[in-house]
Amino acid sequence: MADVERLVDLLAKVREKSRHLVLKVEGRYVAVGDLHGDLDTLERVLEEWEPPYLFLGDYVDRGDHGLEVVEQVFQLLVEGKAVALRGNHESPAMNLDGGFLDELCEKIGRKCGAVYKEFEKTFAALPLVAVVNGKIVALHGGIPLKDDMTPAALEEVEKISGDMAIPRDPLAFQILWNDPCPCEKYAPSPRGPGIWLFGAEVTKAFHERHGTRTIVRGHTYVPSGCALHHSGGVVTVFSSSAGPYKRTKPKIALVKDGVEVYDLATKNSAKCPQDIDIF
């Protein structure tokens, strides 16, 4: 059984360190895409790549070791060795059906409901965006669109307020859920209402507005473990090979002034497919 007192204390420490929706960080980071309870991949990353790490969200659900994964990620965050962004699966709406709540009850027992409430508060406090060296934007899903269908500025994201447990603010919601598409402007997403596919013109306008070069993101399952979109203006990294993702070739990325993708199995530089249709 998990040490409940220690776990609750860890979650409180994460909340203490998570005070901004948009982080600005300096240095070189190892970016890790969706893990979805893939403890083997996480441990391999920690063994073979030096910190600091930049986790792009989706630590839980679908795989068998969501609790162990999110504990390790949060411990690294508290120790100052990692940035941990929020994914769309860091949400009660997803954890109910995705498996994390059931996993928690199996591993913690009768206190799982109270402990999950602590997770819910902690997930709600996680940052949505990290800007690395002023040039690389890291987030889970994609560029959020305003009512006039132009890309929102990060300054607007910083001002988001209200209950974030299930983000009702459309900009926060879209950061967690949007995806790039091989199109010019935008299109409704098959994922559901309020979610958008954003095209090359949106990416270009976003980078011009912020003086940035590349967005590194997770969220989208690609069997190759990575994909380039919009002439390299967006890079997708997927790291899980657990649960339904056993055929994935997991990737990570080194992020500094650019984004270099590497194969987790070989540690060689990876060639990623370009402008694929992800749906």
Provide a role label for each language-model segment.
Residues M1-F279:
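Feature recognizes metal-dependent phosphohydrolase scaffolds
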